[in-house]
Structures are given as C-alpha cells and as structure tokens.
Amino acid sequence: MRVTAKVDYAVRAAMVLARAAEDDSGPIKGERIGAEQHIPVKYLENILSELRQSGIVRSQRGAEGGYWLARPPETVAIADIIRAVEGPLATVRGERAEQLDYGEDAGALQEMWIAVRASLRSVLERVTLADVVSARLPRQVQKLVDDPASWE
C-alpha cells in the first residue's frame, strides 16, 4: 500500500482535532493545523472540506470559527479518514477488486487482491483516532508492530 501525502495529512489533521477534543479547546483554525503539522494550508482546507462532507469533521466560519471532530475520536477509524479523502482502501487500476475480470487463467489474482484489501481493513478499521493519539494501538495491531518482520 502506498500512503499518499493526502492521506497522511488527513490523518495528522484529524489527530490535531482529536487532541483538541480531549482538551475541549473548541474549534481549531486550519492555519494552526497547517502550521503545527507542516501542511500547506490551501491543500489542508480541501482535505478538511472532504472530511466535513464525510461527516468526520464539522466547521464554523468567522473569527471564532474553525474545525472540530463531528464524532468522538474513539469512533473514527483510520479507514474512515482514508475513504473520505481517497475512496476505497484498495483498488486495482482504480477498480474495486470484486469488479475485475481476469478470466480463468488469472482468477486467483483477483482473490489475492480481495485478500489484500481484507488485510488492510483488518488494521485500518480497527485503529481509531483515539488509539493513535494515545499511542496505544489495539493488541492485534501492536503484535504486528512488535514483529521484526513487519519492519523489513
């Protein structure tokens, strides 16, 4: 899996909002998120708009405005953020794996792509914003992190 800058920025911005929710700091300006995370503000505004359209973030305009999480951090899976800014977790040439038609000679390839997507989902749907903000990953995910082979 290739994690794009857009996904990385979206998760990092959501983490800032999750921390702000813990502190009950109110709306956070896009400029502040961009400065803290070294994210270009114009690009960040587009990302935050996509997160808002997906119901992950809320926003308010004006001097007292900014962004905040629309849901508690423990209910926002990393997979939700990825889908909000990029669509399905895993595609092949932009198509969903179950829609591919390889024919009989390569049918197992389609099944492999479906298994890859399921594997990604098993991690990305299990890990929430609250998990990454607290640096406490779910046990099954932490086992993967602790396995030296995962780092190769």
Mark where each language-model region is.
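Beta-hairpin "wing" of winged helix-turn-helix
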Residues: 55-69
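A short alpha-helical element within helix-turn-helix/winged-helix DNA-binding domains
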Residues: 27-38
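Conserved segment of winged-helix/HTH DNA-binding domains
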Residues: 73-98, 110-118
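Alpha-helical residues within the helix-turn-helix
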Residues: 35, 52-53
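Short amphipathic alpha-helical interface segments
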Residues: 10-23
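C-terminal regulatory/oligomerization modules of transcriptional regulators
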Residues: 98-152
